[in-house]
């Protein structure tokens, strides 16, 4: 296939040349790129000029890891990198060899109980009760492009020149189990994607009780482990600690990836910051129970495992059956956490998210939930929509409460038919009404749930996950449907498809408001109950795939009580997700900063809500609420009819601003400038692809009087370009100075009906100055009233718009 011009340009800028039209091999200087195999030494070298991943077949036939990191020159023999030493208390493989022990070897598919005492990547429980396996190299193949994973989300290619995939087959001869290990390397990204397919070619069934997606054995533990953790309403806070001897891990056993831990970690050197130093990012494309674990042994090597949580997995693999693990994505950066994040952003934006909405600017929406909760009528909804239309909003979303007997959270889930008392003309009618107002119409669903007070449950009480004879736990008075059963998924699909095919629905918000308990499926035999959690997630993916394929024009936004399932697996189906149920601007700063470690701006749902905020009771300026929410898909979650005329004018200005800059914000290059986890200020910026426009956000959490001078060093600009700088609070203003030093503020466009927020506009500066000296963010408050209308205080914020002249 023909490589795209843009990809050619990218590769040529890096000095990369394709060797011939008939091969997928490349060269950068004298470094050959692609997947290289040295037959004599049985060594594999995956390289693209940015990274190298080197493996070899070990003396016992297992697959060993020799190197992962910045690209190095290829050679025939890397065997000197295999460290074999005699140590006290080692156990050895061969009678006449006191050097080769798996206890000290870095491996690709480590197993249990054969001289390696570290955690295994796979455990196979056999009919005789043994868990011992011996996966030996059989063969390999190299394919252009990237194969699709069966029934699972994964990254993809659009043409074969983008990547190469190595498939190495290992086999345990006693059981007949094959492990097909998949490694994909991109031509222009420092990325390796890894997964494993297990095939039972034996004659007896076995049980996979551990089946991680990847193992990465590192030669030293001199890294800091970074995780994104928290709870409901404070998801993905950054937690960092040193790796040390022993085991540390994050994971979920809740049935979703969870608010508590995101399926992502980063390993960084102690001196690594946003812009320099080594960092390795590991992200699991999965939405269910997971575990990512680091184990440092007595020889100071570090083993990283990532995949399905083995605590809740017991998969029966019959003869002739196969099992595919989720995909793990590994990113390497030698330019700090910023480069690591940008790599994830571009990959997930362009080669994980799919469909018509992947590259489109996202509509500015208003959601009625915090405006009405369950207390709404058709007329109340129309009034909210009409005011939103006046402000320039594009999409109205009807949230929970429109269906069945749903007037509280005690009833109605599972009955996806409009409540005639609230919506006399049904969803068709309210959708038409909203369209007549001039807005697109969106609708909330919670497909995976039911209430016991529902027609669905009364008809099929055995359709929930529930243990016979045991009490059923509830969350929000609701119960989890057994999505491991095809007939359950079929029924929900039929109800949703009927609405989407008859009503003018342009957007769907898919929610999940509780975790799974009593995970037992009435449709599975006793020896397959350990499959229920994973089969449940496969059912979720199946429903998503059917709906997004049948209704490609519909924009799907995922949600799970906010960010409880904000993960790459769902991003494959829904290009944006509700980042958190916490809409407080101050709390969202940390949540969104942490989320940006892995996820692109275009994936983050962010709304302006009312004050006092419904989650924190905090009051923040309207401009700050907007300045935080701009950096995502943007919308409102309040009743605009309750705002003052001045606030409405400010909202109009916010909507105009977002429409002008949303493509840059959602699809530009994102840089973190100052961390809210380290100080009471935060900064980030987005730069357009041509580097002619940049939008910089600065936030203050708590104000300090008579504060020191502050600057933020910017990134990604053209060092030779001269940038004008406009500072926006609610709208842009210009500033002039009188002879006695007083400032005069004037509206940029002179519109009297806009909210005037006093700000400063700095002089034009060259890109190199802004990147090396920084943008001055000091305020002028002396800690006393001066008569000048200069914004200062808690929860302040500014936007700086830089444009190359």
Question: Which residue ranges define each predicted feature?
Answer:
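Polysaccharide-binding surfaces and accessory modules of carbohydrate-active proteins
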Residues: 37, 42-45, 63-295, 311, ...
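Conserved, mostly hydrophobic/aromatic
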Residues: 50, 196, 320, 366, ...
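Carbohydrate-binding surface patches
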Residues: 265, 274, 676-719
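Aromatic-lined carbohydrate-binding/catalytic grooves of carbohydrate-active enzymes
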Residues: 357-494, 507
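C-terminal beta-sandwich/jelly-roll accessory domains of carbohydrate-active enzymes
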Residues: 703-805
């Amino acid at each position: 296939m023909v490589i795209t011009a843009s990809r050619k340009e990218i590769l040529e800028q890096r000095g990369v040349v394709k060797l011939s039209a008939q091969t997928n091999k490349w060269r950068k200087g004298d470094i050959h790129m692609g997947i290289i195999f040295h037959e004599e030494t049985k060594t594999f070298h995956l390289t693209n000029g940015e990274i190298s991943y080197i493996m070899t077949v070990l003396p016992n036939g297992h697959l060993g890891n020799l190197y992962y990191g910045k690209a190095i020159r290829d050679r025939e023999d890397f065997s000197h990198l295999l460290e074999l030493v005699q140590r006290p208390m080692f156990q050895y493989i061969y009678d006449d060899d006191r050097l080769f022990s798996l206890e000290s070897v870095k491996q690709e598919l480590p197993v249990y109980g054969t001289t390696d005492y570290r955690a295994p990547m796979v455990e196979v429980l056999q009919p005789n009760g043994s868990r011992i396996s011996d996966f030996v190299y059989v063969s390999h193949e190299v394919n252009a492009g990237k194969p699709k994973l069966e029934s699972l989300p994964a990254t993809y290619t659009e043409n074969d020149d983008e990547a190469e995939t190595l498939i190495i087959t290992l086999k345990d001869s006693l059981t007949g189990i094959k492990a097909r290990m998949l490694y994909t390397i991109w031509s222009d990204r420092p990325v390796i994607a890894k997964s494993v397919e297990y095939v039972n070619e034996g004659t007896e069934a076995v049980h996979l009780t551990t089946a991680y997606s990847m193992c990465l054995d590192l030669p030293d533990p001199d890294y800091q482990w970074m995780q994104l953790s928290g709870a409901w309403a404070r998801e993905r806070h950054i937690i960092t600690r040193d790796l040390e001897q022993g085991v540390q891990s994050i994971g979920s056993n809740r049935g979703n990836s969870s608010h508590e831990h995101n399926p992502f970690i980063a390993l960084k050197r102690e001196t690594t910051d946003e812009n320099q130093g080594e960092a390795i990012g590991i992200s699991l494309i999965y939405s269910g129970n997971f575990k990512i674990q680091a184990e440092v042994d007595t020889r100071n090597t570090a083993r990283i495992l990532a995949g399905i949580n083995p605590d809740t997995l017991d998969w029966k693999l019959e003869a002739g059956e196969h099992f595919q693990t989720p995909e793990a994505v590994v990113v390497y950066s030698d330019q700090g956490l910023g480069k690591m994040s940008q790599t994830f952003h571009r990959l997930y934006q362009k080669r994980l998210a799919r469909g018509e909405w992947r590259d489109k600017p996202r509509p500015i929406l208003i959601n009625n939930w915090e405006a009405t909760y369950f207390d709404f009528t058709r007329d109340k909804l129309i009034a909210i929509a009409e005011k939103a239309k006046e402000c320039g909003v594009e999409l109205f979303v009807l949230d929970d409460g429109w269906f069945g007997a749903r007037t509280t959270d005690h009833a109605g889930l599972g009955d996806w038919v409009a409540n005639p008392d609230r919506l006399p003309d049904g969803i068709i009618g309210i959708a038409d009404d909203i369209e007549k107002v001039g807005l697109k119409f969106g609708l909330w669903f919670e497909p995976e749930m039911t209430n016991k007070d529902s027609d669905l449950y009364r008809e099929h009480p055995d359709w929930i996950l529930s243990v016979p004879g045991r009490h059923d736990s509830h969350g929000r008075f609701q119960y989890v449907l057994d999505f491991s059963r095809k007939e359950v998924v079929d029924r929900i699909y039929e109800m949703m498809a009927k609405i989407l095919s008859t009503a003018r629905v342009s957007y769907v918000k898919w929610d999940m408001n509780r975790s799974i308990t009593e995970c037992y499926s009435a449709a599975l035999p006793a020896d397959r109950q350990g499959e229920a959690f994973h089969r449940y997630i496969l059912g979720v993916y199946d429903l998503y795939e059917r709906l997004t394929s049948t209704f490609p024009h519909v924009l799907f936004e995922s949600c799970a009580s906010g960010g409880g399932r904000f993960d790459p697996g769902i991003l494959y189906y829904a290009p944006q997700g509700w980042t958190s149920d916490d809409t407080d601007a101050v709390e969202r700063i940390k949540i969104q900063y942490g989320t940006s470690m892995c996820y692109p701006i275009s994936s983050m749902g962010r709304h302006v809500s009312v004050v006092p905020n419904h989650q924190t009771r905090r009051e923040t300026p309207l401009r700050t609420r907007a300045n935080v929410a701009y950096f995502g898909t943007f919308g409102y979650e309040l009743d605009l009819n309750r705002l003052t005329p001045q606030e409405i004018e400010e909202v109009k200005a916010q909507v105009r601003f977002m429409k002008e800059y949303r493509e840059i914000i959602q699809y530009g290059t994102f840089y973190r400038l100052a961390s809210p986890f380290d100080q009471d200020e935060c900064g980030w910026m987005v730069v357009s692809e041509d580097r002619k426009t940049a939008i910089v956000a600065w936030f203050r959490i708590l104000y300090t009087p008579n504060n020191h001078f502050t600057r933020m060093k910017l990134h990604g600009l053209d060092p030779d370009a001269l940038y004008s700088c406009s500072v926006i609070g609610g709208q842009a203003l210009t500033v002039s100075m009188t002879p006695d030093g007083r400032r005069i503020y004037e509206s940029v466009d002179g519109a009297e009906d806009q909210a005037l927020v006093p700000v400063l506009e700095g002089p034009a500066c060259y890109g190199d100055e802004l990147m090396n000296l920084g943008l001055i963010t000091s305020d002028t408050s002396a800690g006393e009233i001066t008569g000048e209308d200069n914004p200062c205080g808690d929860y302040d914020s500014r936007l700086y718009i830089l444009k190359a002249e």
